[in-house]
Amino acid sequence: MPYNPIPQISLWAAAITSVGPMIAFAAIMILLRKKPRASAVVSLAAVTASLVCAVFLLIRHWGMEMPMQATVHWMVSGDMVIPLGILLDPLSLLMLVVVGVICFLVQVYSLGYMAGDPGFSRYYGFMSLFAWAMTALVLSPMLLQLYIFWELVGLASYLLIGFWYEKFSATQAGKKAFIMTRTGDLAFFLGILLLLAAGGTINILELNNIVLPGGLNSLLGALAALLIFGGIIGKSAQFPLLTWLPDAMEGP
């Protein structure tokens, strides 16, 4: 599938949507652990900037004729190059706004919900980690990059479910969620490896060029799709990997 380069202003906006929460997470966990008010301000500022940039990108590029992509080389080994990048298409633009709105509303609500909790700063640090992982996942043009942030989403979920770690039930709930979702994630990773072996690439747009015209073996394609769907089942608590969800209520 052909694509256009990302204009500079849009590239900066896309970077801010993801990098802002990442910086907030690092700042809170390293510098602001004992400053709850500052932690909330930094986290909310980052997620607000992320939402504003997401809305800007949606308005600016909605109705685009071709997706836009920018990549850089991350790891090079012989003839194998593993890039990182940003992909903007109608689906990712819409999901960026959805993620931004939900993260913003949750963090605003949490100002009152978590008020007075000894782990207030830590909570906002974990929420910033969650926002970073989600936005970076949505922007990923490579399946390996997507998988890395998929796992970071799982880590953030584990940290939030087991947030009140003084309670044995909370730590057990966190472990249960982590282990059960890893089962699905293993299937997801195997699906990615199968697509790489069958198609020779982990670039989503390049895979579209191979799959849509029927250039991928139908059996391998179906198996890869089922494996990737297994990861989705685990993360979204669908049958049979759903018993961790009620226990997740142990977290905030």
Would you name each region that the model predicts?
Residues M1-P252:
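...captures the hydrophobic TM-helix bundle architecture rather than a specific catalytic motif
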